[in-house]
Amino acid sequence: MFHTISYTGSREKQHNQVISQLKSLIYEEPDRIANLANASALLNFYLSDINWVGFYMYDGKELVLGPFQGLPACIRIPLGKGVCGTSAKERRSVRVDDVHAFPGHIACDAASNSEIVIPVIKNGELIGILDIDSPLKSRFDEKDQAFLEQLVQVLTEQL
């Protein structure tokens, strides 16, 4: 069972609290959809100033919408298109301070102004991406990126 907590202490301590919660949520749960759904809900609960958080799964050809929290979203994203497709194709995290200045940005929600995307890779294979949008410009920084990369690594072990 999930218990809400007040995140206290340094930012690093709070990030560690979220990672611990994720580990508890996915422990011995083999279902990929359940784990991705709970990870999305946990991040939506923890992160401030975001308007969308979720996963797109790679089907061998393109990214397909997976579990998420937020408004309805674009269903399919080709590799190399937009922030999500770029992250998936290049298999690297992409942090964008102003999505309107990103070439080829796909606007699923007009309220989004910044975005961070983390690839989900297991055994060298692309599984999908974690996508988080914010209505604020420059919402995500290096510490957010490091935290989210660590969270995705923990999650990937159970996928």
Predicted regions mapped to residue ranges:
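Intrinsically disordered, low-complexity terminal regulatory regions
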Residues: 1-66, 159
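Juxtadomain coupling helices with adjacent low-complexity linkers
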Residues: 2, 23, 134-159
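A generic structural signal for residues located within well-ordered alpha-helices
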Residues: 31-34, 79, 112, 143
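Regulatory sensory and allosteric helical modules in signal-transduction proteins
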Residues: 50, 58-108
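Short hydrophobic/aromatic beta-strand element in the GNAT-like acyltransferase core
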Residues: 52, 117, 129
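A short, aliphatic-rich beta-strand micro-motif
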Residues: 114-121
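Sensory-domain boundary capping and coupling elements
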Residues: 121-134
